[in-house]
């Protein structure tokens, strides 16, 4: 049985995927895993691959939970995904963050930060 935190994460990921689809993105993968970690959502917007980190919280702004170490891990995971799928080096990609606020078991706020994480 999933923990309450895991259930909240699942609700957030489902809400984020539905939001992206409403915005015209195509979801390619959910919870893509490799030896170094997991990417919550992989989507396509036009000719660009979009790696999405989803953060769902009750009590704090979810964006505050993306540490420098997490950003570095996300970039490494993006490269792993590109390599694992034999995508050319010229593939356009970015990492977005979708921060969700939940209250009473419902998502009450979305904050979609496009290209939130860079290689710098």
Swiss-Prot record:
Coiled coil: none annotated. GO terms for molecular function: nucleic acid binding. SUPFAM superfamilies: Restriction endonuclease-like. It comes from the Bacteria. Disulfide bonds: none annotated. Belongs to the UPF0102 family. This is UPF0102 protein Caur_2698. The lineage of its organism: Bacteria, Bacillati, Chloroflexota, Chloroflexia, Chloroflexales.
